[in-house]
């Protein structure tokens, strides 16, 4: 099948928002990925504006850890996005295939993703939808950030609107809490998403479980309970858990100021995080079970003493 100068090889991905195909340029035989908008959203101007922004964003970012457009471009007769073809797998699939990755492997992947995010931030852009499905790991082990449909470009808000009337562009479990409160995103918002991904790679779960998706108000986010990465993962150093805890803090001002600080703390023991948090912080349920058991023992002893005194 031919399409606007490309030979369609096969479908790579399909969703209710777009279809992605592997295609070959008829002139150069270069393999590329073609992303075509869903016909169901052809009357959605906000979606179409975000879609048109994707390749524009890709052409302005130069990083080995960000999806690239092809070097050549031709006049087009239809609306679609052309990018390099990455032969590999999503980070989601990678985590399924590698359920217990070595700490060093996780560090290397997180550092690559951070480099890609810094390329966005240097251009005053926020990715806003960082999640395992939007990260590809190629056959050489290189991590690449993909899908720029939710990217915010400073000064071009009208072309890529942020969340409107509670319509969060990112995926709930990885979306920073400030977005749910109607606040503007910052680089620390992308930091939150990266922290959640790092936590998930090491533990196989999410730091707040399903709580993020349920919370909406400032007070609800203030009550979020971080589940320590040390639970059931004794091989993870306490200072790694401390770094993760700070990266995914519900309050953006209590997160790291920069991505480089986070990646540094994943490699170097921070004295502030050298000891495990108190049991009540790591496992509140277990703490109260112990506390209840101790209290019950105290009550039994007091009753026994009282009984002996009376007799």
Say what each PLM segment does.
Residues 72:
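Activation-segment/catalytic-loop signature of the eukaryotic protein kinase fold
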Residues 38-60:
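AlphaC helix of the eukaryotic protein kinase fold
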Residues 76-90, 94:
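Conserved short submotifs of the Hanks-type protein kinase catalytic core
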Residues 13, 53, 62-65, 168:
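Flexible N-lobe loop architecture of eukaryotic-like protein kinase catalytic domains
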Residues 115-125:
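Protein kinase catalytic-loop region centered on the HRD/HxD motif
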Residues 109-110:
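Activation segment signature within eukaryotic-like protein kinase domains
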């Amino acid at each position: 099948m031919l399409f606007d100068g490309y030979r369609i090889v096969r479908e790579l991905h399909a969703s209710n928002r777009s279809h992605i195909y592997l295609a070959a340029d008829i002139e150069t035989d270069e393999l590329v990925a073609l992303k075509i908008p869903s016909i169901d959203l052809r009357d959605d101007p906000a979606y179409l504006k975000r879609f048109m922004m994707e390749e524009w964003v890709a052409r302005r970012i130069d990083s080995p850890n960000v999806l690239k457009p092809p070097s050549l471009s031709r006049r087009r007769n239809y609306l679609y996005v052309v990018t390099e073809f990455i032969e590999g797998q999503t980070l989601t699939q990678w985590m399924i295939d590698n359920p217990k990755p070595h700490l060093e492997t996780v560090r290397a992947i997180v550092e690559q993703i951070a480099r890609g995010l810094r390329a966005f931030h240097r251009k005053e852009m926020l990715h806003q939808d960082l999640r395992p499905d939007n990260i590809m790991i190629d056959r050489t082990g290189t991590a690449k950030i993909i899908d720029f449909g939710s990217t915010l470009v400073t000064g071009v808000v009208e072309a890529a609107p942020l969340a409107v009337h509670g319509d969060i562009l990112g995926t709930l479990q990885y979306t920073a809490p400030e977005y749910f409160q109607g606040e503007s995103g910052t680089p620390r918002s992308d930091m939150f998403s990266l922290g959640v991904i790092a936590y998930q790679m090491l533990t196989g779960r999410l730091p707040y479980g399903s709580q993020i998706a349920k919370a909406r108000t400032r007070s609800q986010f203030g009550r979020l309970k971080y589940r320590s990465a040390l639970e059931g993962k004794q091989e993870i150093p306490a200072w790694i858990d401390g770094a993760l805890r700070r990266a995914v803090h519900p309050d953006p001002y209590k997160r790291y100021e920069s991505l480089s600080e986070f990646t540094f703390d994943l490699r170097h023991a921070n004295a502030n995080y050298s000891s495990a948090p108190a049991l009540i912080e790591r496992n509140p349920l277990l703490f109260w079970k112990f506390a209840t058991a101790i209290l019950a023992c105290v009550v039994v002893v007091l009753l026994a003493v009282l009984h002996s005194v009376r007799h």
